[in-house]
Amino acid sequence: MNLNNLENIRYNEIKEFSDKIKKEFTFSQKKQVMDIIEKLNKDSRKNVIKLGQALEKFLNKYEEELKRTNNMYNFDRRYGNNYLIAGVDEVGRGPLAGPIVAAAVVLDLNVEEMQRIFNIKDSKKLSEKKREELDIIIREKAISYNIALVDNKTIDERGISWSNNEVLKRAVEGLKVKPDLVLSDGYAVKNLNIRNEFIIKGDSKSISIASSSIIAKVYRDSMMKEYSKGLNMYGFNHNAGYGTEEHVQAIKKHGPSKIHRMSFLTNIL
């Protein structure tokens, strides 16, 4: 759109143009968008000026996200630019039902800035819709990824601590490439024959760990929704097996299902 005669362009057309910029924006367009913002801010119409302010706010937010994402990539790259680094994380340690799931992800950490994956963070801080969108992107862009699980019966037999470590170990060992380094969230992975560094709050610092947390979360949530189709009384489709009041009351009323962790129910039954 040519904005040289901005005063003659209707507000709705300008708004449509502004919305399109936000949807299709790439960082290479930054200078062009800044020029557009300047023109909108000089318009005599208050609603057009507000569009310029909103576009400026969008641009600032984009730059903040670019910086945050670059920091997460650089956090991993500091271990070695030519290293294959795997991030590994688990989900489902605490639920009363279902498996514990882990994912390991190897990303190309040397990819050009604008080819990086944006909006990645701790999976718990993302909406379900955003996690599912990022899950697809991570799988497409990853050099390798692998998902592993330990079921509820094994958790009962071996304990949650063993199962937690085992599922992380399986996720890493199932990768199609052997990483030079494994970054794990919070604590080290025992009996792993690959160099391992554990990062406190790693899913908010490491792009590789955060990516693995998203894949693991989406995979497990999908599993629990499938289980819910035959066990709808427990509400697995929205509680994912965690001990909500609704879930606890359902266990007391209907008894445990085939996917419940009996060792977690001693204070309920």
Curated annotation (Swiss-Prot):
Q: What is its EC number?
A: 3.1.26.4
Q: What EC class does the entry list?
A: hydrolase
GO biological process terms held by the UniProt record: DNA replication, removal of RNA primer; mismatch repair
* Protein localization: Cytoplasm
Any one cellular-component term (Gene Ontology):
ribonuclease H2 complex
Q: Which cofactor does it need?
A: Mn(2+); Mg(2+)
Lineage, top-rank taxon, reads Bacteria
User: RNase H type-2 domain spans which residues?
Assistant: 83-269
> Per its UniProt record, what InterPro entries does this chain match?
RNase_HII, RNase_HII/HIII, RNase_HII/HIII_dom, RNaseH-like_sf, RNaseH_sf
Q: How is the cofactor bound?
A: Manganese or magnesium. Binds 1 divalent metal ion per monomer in the absence of substrate. May bind a second metal ion after substrate binding.
Stated role? Endonuclease that specifically degrades the RNA of RNA-DNA hybrids.
Q: What is this protein called?
A: Ribonuclease HII
